[in-house]
Amino acid sequence: MRLLVLRGVDEVTVSSRSTVVIKSGNRVFERALRDVDAVLVVGSGIKISSSLPPVLALHGIPLSILAKGHVAVLLNPVGTKYNNYRALQYTLPKNKALAIALEYLKSRVRGMASIIRNRGGRLPALPEPPDPALYEDPARLESDIRSWEAAASNTLWDEVFKLLDPSAARELRERYGFAGRKPGHPDPLNKAISAMYAVLYTLSTKALVAAGLDPTYGFLHRTQYSVPLAFDYAEAFKPLAVEAALDLVNEEGLPTLSEDGDLDKDSLNKAMKRLYRYLSAKHRETGKTPYQQIHLKAFCLAKHLEGKCSREKLAFTWDKKRYIIHE
């Protein structure tokens, strides 16, 4: 995973069409773009040269910015109309598109359940997901998917938070007014999860583009997100970030926030290392890593639109016990 994460630097620019220049105080660093798959900027105080986005776009490298609780992913949209997979994506019947999005949500639910089960928590009873085959009206199907997802997620998050170290959980409630998973809430746990989610959105965008798909055209997420298909797709991989966040808090304590409200540089580095540990884990049977699956499942989605990959094979399900974790 060649992700360039920038936090606590002053300015990011380019010196040519192949090199990123990072300025921090009196120090200047250079990074060759051939060694970068994606760029994530964290914080609102970093000056970004106007020359950076077009140069990254030239290399097909997405630029993500996470600041003040929001993430935006920028990429080059040129040529999206001239690809067979994208043509199929744009003309996909709404019910079929929703059925695909549902598979990713079901995968996230299974992954969250595995975290609870593997850590000795109480696995709660969950509502049954809707069956797309029983629906003719896409509006009703979408409404039922959203209702099911909200109910299942709230139930699972309640149990996940019970897995936190008691002292950390108490500090979250008393100091930060913590009340569960809320992306914009100014507490260090939500900030850590959001930062890791931003990585998944960035990697998903890169994978979808490589597979010939348009990440700006989503199935369930709407256009208020910069890359709604990447948000749909990344649902399946979110349990990796949840697992990593639990490890971070339970083993190292709550992350530290900087003055701008985001994770400070040291805490961000720790969060990224925890996430990378799981992204690079090898499956005990297939030998594939979750990072590889982000790309492989994107190609499966493209093939599915042609009828060459079944819907059941679209999603990735995280289960820590099935992986070899490198310390």
UniProtKB/Swiss-Prot annotation:
Q: What is its EC number?
A: 3.1.-.-
Look at the named UniProt entry and state the broad enzyme category this protein falls under: hydrolase
List GO BP terms, alphabetically.
defense response to virus; maintenance of CRISPR repeat elements
Q: Which residues bind Mn(2+)?
A: E149, H221, E235
- UniProt keyword terms in alphabetical order: Antiviral defense, DNA-binding, Endonuclease, Hydrolase, Magnesium, Manganese, Metal-binding, Nuclease
Provide a Gene Ontology MF annotation, just one: metal ion binding
Q: Which InterPro entries match?
A: Cas1, CRISPR-assoc_Cas1, CRISPR-assoc_Cas1_C
Which Pfam families would you find in this protein's record? Cas_Cas1 (PF01867)
Name the cofactor(s) required for activity, per the record: Mg(2+); Mn(2+)
Q: Which domain of life is it from?
A: Archaea
Q: What protein family is recorded?
A: Belongs to the CRISPR-associated endonuclease Cas1 family.
Q: Which NCBIfam families match?
A: cas1
HAMAP family xrefs: Cas1
Q: What does this protein do?
A: CRISPR (clustered regularly interspaced short palindromic repeat), is an adaptive immune system that provides protection against mobile genetic elements (viruses, transposable elements and conjugative plasmids). CRISPR clusters contain spacers, sequences complementary to antecedent mobile elements, and target invading nucleic acids. CRISPR clusters are transcribed and processed into CRISPR RNA (crRNA). Acts as a dsDNA endonuclease. Involved in the integration of spacer DNA into the CRISPR cassette.
Share what the entry says about its subunit structure, partners included.
Answer: Homodimer, forms a heterotetramer with a Cas2 homodimer.
* Official protein name in the record: CRISPR-associated endonuclease Cas1
